[in-house]
Amino acid sequence: MVGVIRRLNVVRELLNIRAGPGAALLPKEVTKVHMQFAHRIEEGHMGPRKFWRENLPKLKYWNPAVPMVINRTTDQKGPAVMTIYFRDDKDAKPSSTPFPTSSADGSSPAPKPAQGERIVTIDMKNRNSSVILKEFLDKTGAVAVQPTAKDEEEFREFEDLHRRSEIDRERIRKMNDAKKREKAMLAKAMSDAQSIKAASA
């Protein structure tokens, strides 16, 4: 049972990251992606956070060479902005200035575009993650990745495993309940026997 659950979790993670909203190939002109939003979801930061947790991993999976940096701040009333960097000059050499690493203390703001680059921003505040994703795909020209036949087959296998695991889980629950009832009945019988014995002494 534990092995089945472990396999279910692995299959679920693979399917979730390979397909679905956010699985898309970015054009080569996109050089970097930067997101800034607050730690908590209040004040309009729920959509950006959900995009970061659910959509960005898929984008990173399909575009491993594109740096994607997250700058989380403690300013709930502050902006929630995505900055997308494009290379305008196809012959321009990549910038030698290191792109900042992700930060949880607001210390990695979006840098200015390098020479030969331009930026496009998306205001994410008070917006649903699906709306943010649509604007991202529209502005970048990214192409959504469709599930392959193998993905669909694995999804069917996952559904079958999930269904069987639910059946097994219910069967084990009933067995455990029966054992508990049997144990309770045995304890009651022993208690009754002790009471009868004590009464007849």
UniProtKB/Swiss-Prot annotation:
Any one GO MF annotation of this record: structural constituent of ribosome
Self-association state and partner proteins as the record states: Component of the mitochondrial large ribosomal subunit (mt-LSU). Mature N.crassa 74S mitochondrial ribosomes consist of a small (37S) and a large (54S) subunit. The 37S small subunit contains a 16S ribosomal RNA (16S mt-rRNA) and 32 different proteins. The 54S large subunit contains a 23S rRNA (23S mt-rRNA) and 42 different proteins.
Main location group: mitochondrion
Known role: Component of the mitochondrial ribosome (mitoribosome), a dedicated translation machinery responsible for the synthesis of mitochondrial genome-encoded proteins, including at least some of the essential transmembrane subunits of the mitochondrial respiratory chain. The mitoribosomes are attached to the mitochondrial inner membrane and translation products are cotranslationally integrated into the membrane.
Domain of life: Eukaryota
Protein name from the UniProt record: Large ribosomal subunit protein mL61
Pfam families with a match to the protein in the record: L51_S25_CI-B8 (PF05047)
Locations listed in the record: Mitochondrion
GO cellular component: mitochondrion; ribonucleoprotein complex; ribosome
Gene name per UniProt: mrp49
Region (Disordered): 87-118
Keywords: Mitochondrion, Ribonucleoprotein, Ribosomal protein
Species annotation: Neurospora crassa (strain ATCC 24698 / 74-OR23-1A / CBS 708.71 / DSM 1257 / FGSC 987)
Similarity comment text for this entry: Belongs to the mitochondrion-specific ribosomal protein mL61 family.
SMART domains noted in UniProt: L51_S25_CI-B8 (SM00916)
Annotated Polar residues bias: 94-106
